[in-house]
């Protein structure tokens, strides 16, 4: 038959829609999916005679014999070499601004950078003040944090678009550590008693000159800056030792669930400000539930003025935020609603004398200028060292993921290692200037990108806006109610809380990811932020192990007129050769799933142990001359075969999906091969990757004369099996 007269062979899915046939070029292969898994072995006779298939021989590359000592010496020599070129590259690599700033296109980019920097700066002013409360700090420290982070990332960062500064989840984690250490030190956690003269519901002694006395606010920033310093050290160390792989264990589902769970805790911590209640911040396991219990127990003490102010701010902020998102493609810049609300609320509080008349909680005095730098408290390091680990991992994971996301979107590359250095120094250096932990923030990054940002020069503009506030405008926020700041914080949680909308889609795509999301979210919200992250990571790793412990297995069939093998449980019209079964195991073979591998292989083919036992039993009964049918054993091992099990002569194990073997995996393959050979069935391995081949060689799976049991393709293994059966005089009606 000529090639022109042949029709293309089409394998269509069993669950395909009938009557929807479309013409396909003859060169295309179409597989028809099975409706449900099946182990029926349908035989299709082939008209072509058996043709020889030559063995493939490949010579492996020679491996270098460099030992560990030589490797270390070589690396040290390479790292310790010094030359002007290498010194220049090192400096330019550490300070990326030296690379891109001389090439900066002023006419093309300056307008977008100035606009985006100004807008982000305007948004950061109220958010920095609001998030300071979340971190248990004075408003001035939030402004310091955003200012220094913007400048340092401008010098060290490789992303053109991300906005580095305060981030709600990190502020929450810092605040929990601060409250715990304040409680240990004997400070009152109900009233905020700043050392800079801020007005509070409680009375405290103020001290700005004596180093011997440190009030609550002073001690709070000591704790915050010490945690920040340690988190930065961890991040720089991870960059130096190139252990950024840690972020691999923080999947998108895990991070999303963690942020959503933490958002509930943030919302809960800010609810007292909306109601004007003076409550201690609950910490530890179940803090969210404890806080709500305290709120409802004290609900009768609600400050009506604060409540009305909160409702009015919500009525303004929520709709305008939604309008900003809905019309962001038409708006050249988002409406700075938060700043408008802050200004209006400050004026209303000042001229209405709300604090004097209704005892509302206000921000109080915010000083201008900068405080002298001060080192973190080294005595606190043992107490906060563990807390800083989780904070550092979350900070760099979010920063690196956002950097890579926006770099991919805009067609440039970022250096993940340099990003860890950048965010690390954004924490180390500001920790000496009374700042707390920072990272990239998605909401502000989206605003920055949508308003025309082209480079990190926009970060300088943001810093200039904050500098203006720090030097001139800050005292004007004296009468700003804390309830307004709480509303701003809660409104900015909308993005994280909207993740619930994505759950149906996530469930359809991956049920395992959805379960990880729920476990992480619930544990972060109901147990604690740090334990929630740990539980999420452990559960995520458990899910990975579970997937490899119960992997997918299938028997393969040949696609007609090709050398392609596919799962017979997934596709129709596949050829199964008599006497040969091809088994695929889709997972690494190691100690966790070795028993699953054996049981699945025995179920899909036959159990050699039971067959051997039946043969011995038959021999004792002296019925060797009669054929052994083993019909009872077939039922016992649940194998549905369309022919006598003992007609099976060869099992080919497709190793293409086996990424690696450990010692237990090699022993399992040896055991399986030995058991099958005991009943006259040969076992062949096909498509082993170089790593698996190397493991088999080191594990002495094959002797020198048995190297022919390893094949580079399944088709080659099948051809070898049929040839060996023909040589033994076994009738094979269908050749390859």
Curated annotation (Swiss-Prot):
Subcellular location: Cell membrane; Apical cell membrane
Residues annotated as transmembrane: 114-134, 139-159, 229-249, 257-277, 380-400, 422-442, 457-477, 526-546
UniProt modification remark: N-glycosylated.
Region (Disordered): 1-28
Listed GO CC annotations: apical plasma membrane; plasma membrane
Keywords: Cell membrane, Glycoprotein, Membrane, Phosphoprotein, Transmembrane, Transmembrane helix, Transport
Residues listed as glycosylation sites in the UniProt record: 201, 207
Residues the record lists as Phosphoserine modifications: 12, 16
Domain STAS, first and last residues per copy: 570-721
Catalytic activity: oxalate(in) + sulfate(out) = oxalate(out) + sulfate(in); sulfate(out) + 2 chloride(in) = sulfate(in) + 2 chloride(out); oxalate(out) + 2 chloride(in) = oxalate(in) + 2 chloride(out); bromide(in) + chloride(out) = bromide(out) + chloride(in)
Principal subcellular localization: membrane
Signal peptide: none
GO BP: chloride transmembrane transport; chondrocyte differentiation; chondrocyte proliferation; sulfate transmembrane transport
Topology of this chain in the membrane: Multi-pass membrane protein
Domain of life: Eukaryota
Cysteine pairings via disulfide bonds: none
GO molecular function terms attached to this record: bicarbonate transmembrane transporter activity; chloride transmembrane transporter activity; oxalate transmembrane transporter activity; secondary active sulfate transmembrane transporter activity; solute:inorganic anion antiporter activity; sulfate transmembrane transporter activity
Family (UniProt): Belongs to the SLC26A/SulP transporter (TC 2.A.53) family.
Function: Sulfate transporter which mediates sulfate uptake into chondrocytes in order to maintain adequate sulfation of proteoglycans which is needed for cartilage development. Mediates electroneutral anion exchange of sulfate ions for oxalate ions, sulfate and oxalate ions for chloride and/or hydroxyl ions and chloride ions for bromide, iodide and nitrate ions.
Protein name, entry field: Sulfate transporter
The organism of origin for this protein: Equus caballus (Horse)
Taxonomic placement: Eukaryota, Metazoa, Chordata, Craniata, Vertebrata
Gene this protein is translated from: SLC26A2
